[in-house]
Each structure stands twice: as C-alpha cells, then as structure tokens.
C-alpha cells in the first residue's frame, strides 16, 4: 500500500550500493509446497512395520520334533491422512499446519556497509523499540500472515481474468483472508486479532492506488486491455504483511510489468541494515526507467512515479515515519536493524505524478486528535465502534457496514472527518489514458539477515 510523499499530502495511517551482492540462503516456497498438503503416519516406521514383529515369533513343533518358527504377518501400513486446501481457500491455516511452523520468507544475507554513521539518541530509542517488538511470537505471526497472503493471492490470480467484477474479486480476497486467519471480524475486537490490514486495493489503468469497490457505486468489470493492480494486506496480532502485484491479459503491457517488477527486486536487493535510502531510491529509478513500452505504434518510456513511496511498517500501522521514494532524492535516513519495510514501486506511461480523485477509498483513525471535541451522540458512538474494531488500521465502508448494529452512520462519519478525528483517503490517479503497474513485498531486517517475508513462487 503506497504512502504519499509528505510534500503533497499529510501523512496518515493510510496514506546501499547499486552493485552490492545478494546471497540467497533459502529460496522461497510456493503456497502449495509450504503447507497445502500435510499428513501424519501414526505409530509407523518407514517400512510400516512395528519393531516387535521382527523380534517375536511362535514356536511350532514339526513332525520330527524339531522346533520351527512361524513369523507373524506384517501389519498393513495405515493410509496417510491428507489435509488439502480448498478452492477457494477457506481452511484456516491453524488447521492446515496443525502446530507445524509456517514457511520462511526468502532469507538474504545483509550486505556489510562501510559508510556507517553514529546514530542519534532518537534513532537509538526507535531501534530498541523495534527490537523489543521482536518477541517469541514475532516471526510466527509474520510467517502466518505471509502464508495467508500467498494462498489468497494465488486464488485471486486465478480469477482475475477479463469478465470478473471488482466487487467479486474484492470479496474473494476479503473472505479468503478472514477464513485463513480464522477471524471473521464480526465480534467486537475480532478484526484486531487477525485479518485485513487495510482495504483491498483494485486499481485499473491510470488509477495508481487507493481504489476499492463499495456498495452503491457503478460496477466495474475487468477487460482484456486493462492493467489491474491488486494490493492487499494481512495482519496477525498487528504484524502487517503488505504485498501487491499487477496482472494484464494483453501482452502489450509485458514490458511495463517487467520494468516495475525489476525495480521492486532492485529495491529489495539494496535494502538492509544501514542501507542509505537515497541510494536505494536512485537504484530503483535507474532500473525502472531503462524500460520502454510500445503502445499504439508509439514508444513510451516507463517513468517512476514521483509522489508516492514505499514505507516502513509499524505494529497496527501500515505507514511509519520512513519513506522509500522511487526517484533520486536527498535524505540522510537509513534502514535500521529491526525495521520492517514495504518495498514497492509504481511505473507509469503518463506523467508519473498522482493526484486525488473523487470518491473515498477508506478511513483511518487520527490518534493525535482528542475525542473531547465531539458533541454529537451518533459521532461518539461511531468513533467508539471504530476504536473497538479497527484501532489504527485503515478500513473501507464495506468493512464497517458488515459489523452488527452499524447503520445510518454517514452523518456521524462526516462529523468525524470534519473534526479531524478520522481521515478519509481518496483514490490516486495519473492522467486518463495512461497505465500504471505496481509490485510490492514486505521485508524484515532481522539482526542476522533480511527476510523477504511475502516472497512466493509467483513474484
């Protein structure tokens, strides 16, 4: 989920060297290979025999009085009990893995930097806080969220074909996340335990980010010549995995998708402890803008979008205070041990500068505003519902409307937005007729390595 640059938009909850070598220690596993099939053999050795069978016999006298051993028949092997994910995926991961560890992401060695600078006191405090969050459940929660994302997006990729409606696609993703995390989000506070980290983004063509279908709007159907960006997040106990991909049925857009995917992988390769963000941004832009696209007989350069960025992720907060632009920039910020980053890139055939469009993508609580300014009872009640069910997570109208007892909330929401207690987020668009692609992964900067937690066989 992209973060708008601070000079263009007030930040809300939604809102290294180029030739460094990257060593892959542990390649990614596909969802199918990392938990879709699981079985157990109970009380069996490899050959299916019990040990006692080989040691025990029955003494039988022969006609000449000699003793002869009669071997017992070997027990037949029991059949393997197989648990297989359904299509669409609806079996919770807790059932599928049965207390087995969730798959790792892609493990990559840190690149040693020789241009380190002394951290300030503020940076040290932030560093300590990040490491303290890495408790015993940290990797378990993150790997579970990542595996949910892989399985749900695999299903989404199979149905994201021309003719599918955006409403159906969004519902399939939303319901898949809820089913696999085991949290429907209907009971008060349940969505804060695990589920959607932000509204599922389904952006077509010149719409770059922050669009999702809502009830009452005109239905949008995917067409053969569309470029669709699918951006959704999964959280487990507030540990957020943010990952996105682009699909296009028409091969004319292949170079656009290849440019953005290569740029994202470049950013992931450059990311690491003490990596300079300005170096990462420059490397991303260089790769992205080395590509061209042939559209309607014209050769069009792929441009890196200038005013939306990658970002670090905090617990229950999709956007932290660090940003990773896709264009060359001046900043002294560095990545630090314990940081979690959403490394994403957007490439456009248009102006590569996004602006707010009409409509509302989602809402997010502004923690810096006190509810003491509220006097309207309906607004107070709605704010209480938001705090209890979403906290600092960004949510869409359809997520709010499915909660029991929520109805006729529009006046209260308008009051909350006008008072600054809740922020609303509009779709972000380039010029009409342009095409934008996006790819994104979440990377954990662990003390001894970086783990691209959302990596899969697909991208």
Curated annotation (Swiss-Prot):
<feature type="compositionally biased region" description="Basic and acidic residues">
    <location>
        <begin position="1"/>
        <end position="12"/>
    </location>
</feature>
<dbReference type="InterPro" id="IPR050247">
    <property type="entry name" value="Met_Aminopeptidase_Type2"/>
</dbReference>
<protein>
    <recommendedName>
        <fullName>Methionine aminopeptidase 2-1</fullName>
        <ecNumber>3.4.11.18</ecNumber>
    </recommendedName>
</protein>
<dbReference type="InterPro" id="IPR036388">
    <property type="entry name" value="WH-like_DNA-bd_sf"/>
</dbReference>
<dbReference type="GO" id="GO:0046872">
    <property type="term" value="F:metal ion binding"/>
</dbReference>
<feature type="binding site">
    <location>
        <position position="311"/>
    </location>
    <ligand>
        <name>a divalent metal cation 2</name>
    </ligand>
</feature>
<dbReference type="InterPro" id="IPR036005">
    <property type="entry name" value="Creatinase/aminopeptidase-like"/>
</dbReference>
<keyword id="KW-0378">Hydrolase</keyword>
<keyword id="KW-0479">Metal-binding</keyword>
<keyword id="KW-0031">Aminopeptidase</keyword>
<feature type="binding site">
    <location>
        <position position="440"/>
    </location>
    <ligand>
        <name>a divalent metal cation 2</name>
    </ligand>
</feature>
<keyword id="KW-0963">Cytoplasm</keyword>
<dbReference type="Pfam" id="PF00557">
    <property type="entry name" value="Peptidase_M24"/>
</dbReference>
<feature type="binding site">
    <location>
        <position position="210"/>
    </location>
    <ligand>
        <name>substrate</name>
    </ligand>
</feature>
<dbReference type="GO" id="GO:0004239">
    <property type="term" value="F:initiator methionyl aminopeptidase activity"/>
</dbReference>
<dbReference type="InterPro" id="IPR000994">
    <property type="entry name" value="Pept_M24"/>
</dbReference>
<dbReference type="GO" id="GO:0070006">
    <property type="term" value="F:metalloaminopeptidase activity"/>
</dbReference>
<dbReference type="InterPro" id="IPR036390">
    <property type="entry name" value="WH_DNA-bd_sf"/>
</dbReference>
<feature type="compositionally biased region" description="Acidic residues">
    <location>
        <begin position="43"/>
        <end position="54"/>
    </location>
</feature>
<dbReference type="GO" id="GO:0006508">
    <property type="term" value="P:proteolysis"/>
</dbReference>
<feature type="region of interest" description="Disordered">
    <location>
        <begin position="1"/>
        <end position="79"/>
    </location>
</feature>
<feature type="binding site">
    <location>
        <position position="440"/>
    </location>
    <ligand>
        <name>a divalent metal cation 1</name>
    </ligand>
</feature>
<feature type="binding site">
    <location>
        <position position="242"/>
    </location>
    <ligand>
        <name>a divalent metal cation 2</name>
    </ligand>
</feature>
<feature type="compositionally biased region" description="Basic residues">
    <location>
        <begin position="67"/>
        <end position="79"/>
    </location>
</feature>
<comment type="function">
    <text>Cotranslationally removes the N-terminal methionine from nascent proteins. The N-terminal methionine is often cleaved when the second residue in the primary sequence is small and uncharged (Met-Ala-, Cys, Gly, Pro, Ser, Thr, or Val).</text>
</comment>
<dbReference type="InterPro" id="IPR001714">
    <property type="entry name" value="Pept_M24_MAP"/>
</dbReference>
<dbReference type="GO" id="GO:0005737">
    <property type="term" value="C:cytoplasm"/>
</dbReference>
<feature type="binding site">
    <location>
        <position position="319"/>
    </location>
    <ligand>
        <name>substrate</name>
    </ligand>
</feature>
<keyword id="KW-0645">Protease</keyword>
<dbReference type="InterPro" id="IPR018349">
    <property type="entry name" value="Pept_M24A_MAP2_BS"/>
</dbReference>
<comment type="similarity">
    <text>Belongs to the peptidase M24A family. Methionine aminopeptidase eukaryotic type 2 subfamily.</text>
</comment>
<feature type="binding site">
    <location>
        <position position="242"/>
    </location>
    <ligand>
        <name>a divalent metal cation 1</name>
    </ligand>
</feature>
<feature type="binding site">
    <location>
        <position position="344"/>
    </location>
    <ligand>
        <name>a divalent metal cation 2</name>
    </ligand>
</feature>
<dbReference type="InterPro" id="IPR002468">
    <property type="entry name" value="Pept_M24A_MAP2"/>
</dbReference>
<feature type="binding site">
    <location>
        <position position="231"/>
    </location>
    <ligand>
        <name>a divalent metal cation 1</name>
    </ligand>
</feature>
